[in-house]
Amino acid sequence: MNQPPPLTFNYERDTLLAQTIALCALITNHEPNVVERSKSILANVGNYPALAYLEKRFSKGSSTFLTELRIELLKELNSVEIDGKETPLTEFQYDVWRTLPSAAATAVSAPTSAGKSFIVIEYLCNRATIEKTFTSVFIAPTRALLSEVQHRIEKRLEGVADVRVSTVPAPDVQARNRQIYVLTQERLHVLLSAAKLSVDLVVVDEAQGLADGSRGMILQDCLERLRNENPKLQAILLAPGANGFIRVGEQLGMPGIVVKETELSPVLQNRVQVTVKQGIAKQFHLSLLTLTGTREIGVVTTTRGVADPSTRLAVAALELAKSGAALVYATGPADAERVSAQFVADRPIATSDSLPQISNFIKQHIHPDYGLAAMVRHGVAFHYGNMPKLLREALEDAFRRGDIRYLVCTTTLFQGVNLPAQSVFINTPTRGKGTPLEAAHLWNFAGRAGRLGQELAGNVFLVDYEDWATKPMNESSKFDIVPSFSETISDHFDAVLEAIAGKMPKRSPRTPEHARIRAAAGLLLARASTKSTSRVLNRLSTLVEFLNFRMHSLLFRHVASLSTG
């Protein structure tokens, strides 16, 4: 008689399944016994943000005394003191929190909604509070993210005297003993070139940027210079989901880097395929993407036409996100303006007090006829990187408050800006004029669906997904971090040597390859000036093997030329 296969336990898979069962039960059934059992499951898996939401929504009387006692005990075991209050953490957050004090280098890979930046910013602020002298750098990839991080740190450190928090790459004229710089890698590069800086803690947000061409090399250069200045530097690298941190640690001189990773999100995220059947007017057919395939959910009959592909994205958002905030992906600034304009005709003037103020600001300081001024009054806006800082921040704040209901955005929001929404809408896996997007970028954006502590689930609506050239949302995808410097040396070795010899690629026409070659050559020349070139190259095991191969190839060619001569 055949024995059944032994049961295997996979913590992440089984925890996700248990959490999904509990959250789905709560969404569909509010009976007291369902609420009690779901709360018990969520406590078992350490999903305390969802429990906090339930405590606001359901009275404690919906559970028995023993259940409530057990939940409180579990919360107590996972609680730490943050800003003077006992705060329960998820299992993953608690694990990271315990690891940070003793690790010289830590990499944290987790979904957008897992709360990794919360833990790291709290750790940074805790050190700034208790240490007499402390210098930290928080590296963020975009200017849009700098303001948000600066605000979070300043808010956390309210009441703590003599701590400077700055996004300006200049030394403190007051020479305070505790300083926190919040900078892009370019700004940090300027600071390191102008002043000698000994840093105790560096945090790299969106660390997958190490693979981002010449910008990745600037980031690597900054990290190496910080470590050279202070060998005891503590480094924390954050990414929304990434592989390759061990390799990154070796190449950055952090061979003992501790990697903490999870794919669990405290919020249930549904990927919903939105399809229009040919010949059937005013209907969206919805199906759920799961690990085992696609399951039909049902049909939504619309009040608007759905036949035109150019307006279908906006129509889908209007019909399927009638409550809650929605992020809508656009391929570029022009596309963002075009799509956002499609919302206005079907949206009434909003009653918010802040939106007329934003509208007037746009008219007075940008242009009286700028289309965004009229849009915001309807609770609609577009968002991209090349916008005035004050305007961009005002739009983000209005979206967080719920005054702006539909925000049409470009890839600017893919990196770090904390703008979760109840729903996310995507209708293409490309950017610009059809350039394919890396699947991990789309998953990072989709991870903004579901506001932690405000709802149990978020929805990612994939419009016309059946027609996409690729299917990147079928299964989870991570960034594969290969530092741009080592990749450029391997792929363009001869060109880098020529650049070092003085034959730099021309600045025009500008290509990504030329920029990478110039940056790699510049990094090596900078290291040569400090006699540290060998230290950098010795970390690149793949490069050493490549150089051996190149040497043997050149010898073979030399011998061959002698024999034929």
Give the role of each language-model region.
Residues M1-G565:
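N-terminal helicase ATP-binding lobe
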